[in-house]
Amino acid sequence: MKFRILSLSLSEGYKIGTLQEMNLSFSPIVSTGGKLTLEGNDGAEKYANMVYVDLSNNSQIQIKRKSWNLGFYCGDEFRVILNSSYATVAVASEKTDFAAVTLEDAQKAPNIAAGAMSEDFSADWIDDVEGDLTKTAFGMIAENAAENKVFFVASADNKTNTDGTENRSLWYKVKVTRNGEGYRVEYGKVGDTTPKTVEIAKNPIYNFVGLSLESGEKVDAQAEGKKWDIMWAYAAAVSQMASGPVTAFSQDVVTSNSVGGVETAVVMVDEQTTYDNFKVTDITSKADFEKKANVIGTTWRTPAMPGVTNAGVKTD
């Protein structure tokens, strides 16, 4: 904001000096700590939103978790992520031509609609829960368009019929190619022969640009890349069950912005150490910071299950 003195209404005893302009700028106040109630619900659904938290500004941004299916990387490489908060899964077909992929091909493909807790579910159908972009379901988008396979994609609302019975005609088929410095996406239901087409430009403000296959709209998949540290949502995670670690979709997953450079450490404490008396020395002596998305994940709580007597937020 710029202020400039142009004239004076009082002339006697006053005059305009040599400094006639002043610039006033505002910057965010860096938070020293506080409390936030995450607005993950919308009244109709318990975990309707993905909640992005900016710790330095003590602020949050909500994005509807079902507002997008695929995210397109805005960095130097060409990569696509699945929206695990919408329980999105994907598997490659055997073909590279959109029109050549039919419902018959979908019937021969692995059943990506299988429940995450079933024996038929494969972790290969989702992206790496640690956030490693070299381990996504789509893989690197090749420079040669003819090398990119058509993928079958399904999210929570289009995996099966409403009664849970199988219906692979609900799935989408998607082919992604490079388009200059951005992406070109061909998509439609598996029975479509003519694709819908959308071009997506990289936006350096964001880590990813989202695309809704239902509406065809390009949307904000996340908060701005430098304006969030952690995200709370329903999402894919590795949870410790009675039988051991299980990869599944779960509530209350906390994800770190590893793509944006955030590093996270877990520091175990004794009963005498609380949030209020936790010190910097506790971090430097015990912390092992990792640039992984799932360092927190679901580890901050114990899920309710048969045989568990201490379900809830952990105290250590």
What are these regions (language model features)?
Residues 3-7:
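Short, aromatic- and glycine-rich surface loops/edge beta-strands on solvent-exposed regions
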Residues 13-316:
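Surface-exposed, beta-sheet-biased, low-hydrophobicity segments with strongly acidic/polar composition
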